[in-house]
């Protein structure tokens, strides 16, 4: 089969038929694809969809699907500012997660302090910092620095004017919830992030590399797999 070239910088042109022939030579098992889908559903927390997919495809997972609901409840609690509830659920799920991860535990306590500051509960925030966080800071300089930054929010009558006001943003809750979610997944021998988005990023990168070398049937719709 001969290759053709375009007049645009003499780029190699690959026809759709040639491309399809090459794709046909790639062997991807249905089982591997099913595992990829299950990986995404479990990690992203789609419990009902994962259970239905498991039933229909007979794809097994090492995770108890019932635990997905607990993990989502924990993430939701942290994102809503109810740190105590999140800690309670994770301890019921697996107390070793926090017992073996002092940094995670500190960040949860730090988030609890942030929530007290957000509510304007200055006296309670100072007492909580002194009783719960200061002892951890004495044993870890990094924790102490983070505690001092958090407490500095109280210097400003209007916390929104603090250089560290980002600690009060919803993104900080999401960051803490994400750290805890990753720890739970790790305890269940799961990836902390689903594989599918990474594969799609690799696809985009590979197509960018090809764009400079040839003209080919480029995928423009990753949902349907349609070429341009």
UniProtKB/Swiss-Prot annotation:
Q: Which InterPro entries match?
A: CRA_dom, CTLH/CRA, CTLH_C, LisH, Ubq-SigPath_Reg
Per the record, its GO cellular-component terms are: cytoplasm; nucleus
Residue intervals of the CTLH domain? 67-124
Query: Some GO term, biological process aspect, for this entry: which one?
Result: Wnt signaling pathway
Keyword set includes rRNA-binding:
no
Compartments in which it is found: Cytoplasm; Nucleus
Q: Does the keyword Methyltransferase apply?
A: no
Keyword field: Cytoplasm, Nucleus, Wnt signaling pathway
Domain LisH residue range list: 29-61
> Please, which domain of life does this record's source organism belong to?
Eukaryota
As for what it does, the entry says: Core component of the CTLH E3 ubiquitin-protein ligase complex that mediates ubiquitination and subsequent proteasomal degradation of target proteins. Acts as a positive regulator of Wnt signaling pathway by promoting beta-catenin (CTNNB1) nuclear accumulation.
Q: Which family does it belong to?
A: Belongs to the GID8 family.
The cross-references to PANTHER family, in alphabetical order and at most eight, read: RAN BINDING PROTEIN 9-RELATED
Descriptive protein name: Glucose-induced degradation protein 8 homolog
Give the species this sequence originates from: Dictyostelium discoideum (Social amoeba)
């Amino acid at each position: 089969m001969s290759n053709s070239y375009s007049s645009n910088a003499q780029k190699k042109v690959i026809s759709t038929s040639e491309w399809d022939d090459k794709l046909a030579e790639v062997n991807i098992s249905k089982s591997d694809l099913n595992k990829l889908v299950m990986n995404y559903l479990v990690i992203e927390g789609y419990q009902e969809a994962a259970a239905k997919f498991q039933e229909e495809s007979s794809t097994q997972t090492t995770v108890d699907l019932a635990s997905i609901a607990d993990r989502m409840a924990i993430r939701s609690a942290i994102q809503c500012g109810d740190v105590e509830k999140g800690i309670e659920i994770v301890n019921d799920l697996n107390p070793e997660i926090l017992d073996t991860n002092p940094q995670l535990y500190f960040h949860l306590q730090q988030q609890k302090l942030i929530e007290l500051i957000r509510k304007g509960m200055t006296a309670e925030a100072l007492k909580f910092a002194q009783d719960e966080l200061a002892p951890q800071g004495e044993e870890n300089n990094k924790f102490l620095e983070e505690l001092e930054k958090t407490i500095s929010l109280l210097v400003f009558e209007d916390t929104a004017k603090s250089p560290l006001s980002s600690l009060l943003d919803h993104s900080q809750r999401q960051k803490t919830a994400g750290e805890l979610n990753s720890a739970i997944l790790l305890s269940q021998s799961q990836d902390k992030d689903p594989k599918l988005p990474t594969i799609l990023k690799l696809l985009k990168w590979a197509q960018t590399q090809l764009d400079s070398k040839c003209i080919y049937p480029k995928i423009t719709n990753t949902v349907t797999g349609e070429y341009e």
